[in-house]
A protein has these predicted regions:
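Core register positions within helices of long alpha-helical scaffolds
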Residues: 8-11, 39-46, 72-76, 100-103, ...
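Alpha-helical, heptad-rich or low-complexity scaffold/stalk segments
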Residues: 24, 99, 125-133, 160-167, ...
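Amphipathic alpha-helical scaffolding segments comprising HEAT/armadillo-like alpha-solenoid repeats
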Residues: 1, 14-26, 47-60, 78-89, ...
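Residue-level detector of extended alpha-helical repeat arrays and alpha-solenoid scaffolds
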Residues: 2, 33, 37, 66-69, ...
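Long beta-sheet-rich domains in secretory-pathway and surface-associated proteins
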Residues: 156-158, 175, 193
Length: 211
């Protein structure tokens, strides 16, 4: 019954309910926490991003467990929210913070996630996966996307991540990407993706490449 009651909260809350939700989550433990977090996210959702941050940060600052509020900060996703979650990542709430960092929809997360991928072996491949999604949906030029995919591919150890990066390199349609993905045709695990990327690039550049 209690879980159902918390779930029902999700759709009937507004910014004025955050105080009550904060009291609930501070007392709660276990399986009901995600429902209360979702209710908190919904409560501030109508507000602009900066206002979402300003509304929730007082509760973060006075909480004995700031990570309870990371999903709300991740939804806000402004630079201050990112900085606050990173403080937890570099402090006592590494995994809780990382789980929220990969849900932030902000182009500034590209560099943050790359640095995590370089320095945090446990979370490297998940960080690269999210990094790749953000680069793909960004407004960067094809050359810039090639550069960002290339550096990720250099440190990717998971074959699924490698193949995804190779596929996206193909979508840049650049000569530089063609030269790079050809190197992956000799590896059985990446050969199929590399061959497809080569075909994609060549089909878009047949005149330029002498086809």
């Amino acid at each position: 019954v209690r879980t159902a009651a918390y779930k029902a909260l999700e759709g009937v809350v507004g910014p004025s309910d955050l105080e009550r939700l904060s009291r609930l989550i501070e007392k709660e433990s276990g399986k009901n926490i995600p429902q209360i977090q979702k209710a908190m996210r919904n409560a501030v959702l109508p507000l602009p991003k900066d206002k979402q941050y300003a509304t929730v940060i007082p509760y973060v600052n006075k909480s004995c467990n700031p990570s309870l509020y990371y999903p709300v900060l991740a939804q806000a996703g402004n630079p201050e929210s990112i900085a606050e979650i990173l403080k937890g990542y570099n402090g006592n709430y590494k995994q809780e913070a990382f789980a929220s960092l990969v849900n932030i929809d902000n182009i500034k997360m590209i560099e943050v996630l790359y640095n995590i991928a370089v320095n945090d072996k446990t979370n490297a491949q998940a960080a690269l996966n999210r990094y790749t999604s953000l680069v793909a949906k960004s407004a960067h030029t094809s050359i810039r996307k090639y550069q960002l995919y290339r550096r990720a591919l250099e440190i990717a150890s998971d074959v699924k991540v490698q193949n995804r990066l190779i596929n996206l390199l193909g979508e840049t349609h650049t000569y530089q990407a063609l030269m790079l993905v050809e190197k992956y045709m000799d590896n059985k695990a990446t050969a199929e993706a590399a061959a497809e990327a080569v075909r994609t690039i060549a089909s878009k550049n047949s005149e330029n490449f002498g086809g």
